[in-house]
């Protein structure tokens, strides 16, 4: 998958530590074209001290890790985004003013993919109060939820899944969201997703429902919060939405900590 923040973060971090970096884009390598993941892993593992993978399939990064013989870092798959969780946990710790196990956060929107899955597991591991607000058809898989609940039982974490966005955000310290249509999905998905999620937009009104004057807004970016991109303008012209998952008012407000998070 294409990347701005994740790639830059890995490259800057590596170079800050004196490490060399090679970027292999999909069109410039033989992965899954002329060479299997298993063979690629064994070759790269002999040349490099670590591998970061960013792509669609969780199975790919797990196969790389199985055969590379060196650490493999998951920079994002459809299922999980663990390195983003390091940033999110640090950001919430910096802005909450209290221990993470006394902190509550909500994720509202399409909860089937990497960000909601990862936030659910993160919150469970850290003993946090986690709420997911989404239509039931867009909830995380039962397997992910069961795993998170099992972990939360050990850490004292709380997990709530609800179709009511207002119920999800009441009393929270942070409200997270993500794009409603993910990389690789067709344009046709927008209409269905907007119809399903129109009541889950992060607006000033939803922020106020939290009842917490210090509530913060988080988004892993990129975000559709105005018309200043080609896609944002297309969404406005097609659906009449200026900002999709979050409004410009929230994104540019003092409650927004998205750039600290990024």
UniProtKB/Swiss-Prot annotation:
Its EC number is 2.1.3.3. Keywords: Amino-acid biosynthesis, Arginine biosynthesis, Cytoplasm, Transferase. L-ornithine binds at residues 114, 178, 182-183. GO terms for molecular function: amino acid binding; ornithine carbamoyltransferase activity. Carbamoyl phosphate binds at residues 3-7, 30, 54, 81-84, 219-222, 247. Changing residue 153 to K: In strain: Vedros M1801. Belongs to the aspartate/ornithine carbamoyltransferase superfamily. OTCase family. NCBIfam families: orni_carb_tr. Reversibly catalyzes the transfer of the carbamoyl group from carbamoyl phosphate (CP) to the N(epsilon) atom of ornithine (ORN) to produce L-citrulline. This is Ornithine carbamoyltransferase. It comes from Neisseria mucosa.
């Amino acid at each position: 998958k294409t990347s701005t923040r994740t790639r830059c973060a890995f490259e800057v971090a590596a170079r800050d530590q004196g490490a060399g970096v090679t970027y292999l884009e999909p069109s410039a390598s033989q992965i899954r074209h002329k060479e299997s993941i298993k063979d690629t892993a064994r070759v790269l593992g002999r040349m490099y001290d670590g591998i970061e993978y960013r792509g669609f399939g969780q199975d790919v990064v797990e196969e790389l890790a199985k055969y590379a013989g060196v650490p493999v870092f998951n920079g994002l798959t459809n299922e999980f985004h663990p390195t983003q969780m390091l940033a999110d946990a640090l950001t919430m710790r910096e802005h909450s003013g209290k221990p993470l196990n006394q902190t509550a956060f909500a994720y509202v929107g399409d909860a089937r993919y990497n960000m909601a899955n990862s936030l659910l597991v993160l919150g469970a591991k850290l003993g946090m109060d986690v709420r997911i607000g989404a239509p039931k058809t867009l909830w995380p898989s039962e397997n992910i939820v069961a795993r998170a609940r099992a972990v939360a039982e050990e850490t004292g974490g709380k997990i709530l899944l609800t179709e009511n966005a207002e119920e999800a955000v009441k009393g929270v310290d942070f409200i997270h969201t993500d794009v409603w249509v993910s990389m690789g999905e067709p344009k046709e998905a927008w209409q269905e997703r907007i119809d399903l999620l129109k009541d889950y937009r992060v607006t000033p009104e939803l922020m106020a429902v939290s009842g917490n004057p210090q509530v913060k807004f988080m988004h892993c970016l990129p975000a559709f919060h105005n018309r200043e991109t080609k896609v944002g303008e297309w969404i406005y012209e097609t659906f009449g939405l200026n900002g999709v998952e979050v409004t410009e008012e929230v994104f540019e407000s003092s409650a927004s900590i998205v750039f600290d998070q990024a």
